Amino acid sequence: MADEKNKPENPDLDQRDINNPRDREALKQAADDFLKARRAEARAEAAADEAEGEVDETANRIAVLEADNTELKDQMLRVAAEMENLRKRTQRDVQDARAYAITNFARDMLSVSDNLRRALDTIPADALEADSNLKSLSEGVEMTERAMLLALERHGVKKLEPEGQKFDPNFHQAMFEVPNPDLPNNTVVQVVQAGYAIGDRVLRPAMVGVSKGGPKVSAENGASTSEDNA
């Protein structure tokens, strides 16, 4: 097939005599035309190959750009998620800072309040009745204590009053046990020292006494059962 393609298309050329000047000129012209045609075909084939190569290269570049675009989108989503988490964390930290800014101060003031209460408790009742000045002083100290606790309460400090509640180790500290068969086990029966919390944090656990020997509370439904049947 290649030989047929490379032959001149004019069949009359086979009849030409190369020794004849006119035929030789015709053969030369035919050869020139054939070469020009082949060069044109070669250029067309080269242009087609180049165009195909450019298409392939363009397709490859598009594939690379699409991959880069996907990666950039993924990075952007990760950065956006990190920024949102940072925003929430910062907002939470700011809220905590506002809510718990007075934690140490409040704890110190509670110690002062305890000292005031202990001082009041050491004064015998008959002494107060016998000395009006001492009674006035005692009332003034008690008012100061109440004002201090009210000020702390306005800033989010809450008093824990757990008497009659189930013992909670997160908010209570058991100091002793009281045998009482009529109350469920681990019921707070006495508060030795009041506890305080700020927000959901404990400033100071309540020191309490708890019951022992009564019915236990079922963990599933809260029903009381006797200790003998437990």
Curated annotation (Swiss-Prot):
Keyword set includes Zinc: no
Positions of region (Disordered): 1-28, 209-230
Major subcellular location class: cytoplasm
Cellular localisation: Cytoplasm
Compositionally biased spans, kind Polar residues: 221-230
Single GO BP term: protein folding
Oligomer and partners: Homodimer.
Family per record: Belongs to the GrpE family.
HAMAP family xref list: GrpE (MF_01151)
Chain's role: Participates actively in the response to hyperosmotic and heat shock by preventing the aggregation of stress-denatured proteins, in association with DnaK and GrpE. It is the nucleotide exchange factor for DnaK and may function as a thermosensor. Unfolded proteins bind initially to DnaJ; upon interaction with the DnaJ-bound protein, DnaK hydrolyzes its bound ATP, resulting in the formation of a stable complex. GrpE releases ADP from DnaK; ATP binding to DnaK triggers the release of the substrate protein, thus completing the reaction cycle.
Listed name of the protein: Protein GrpE
Organism: Brucella ovis (strain ATCC 25840 / 63/290 / NCTC 10512)
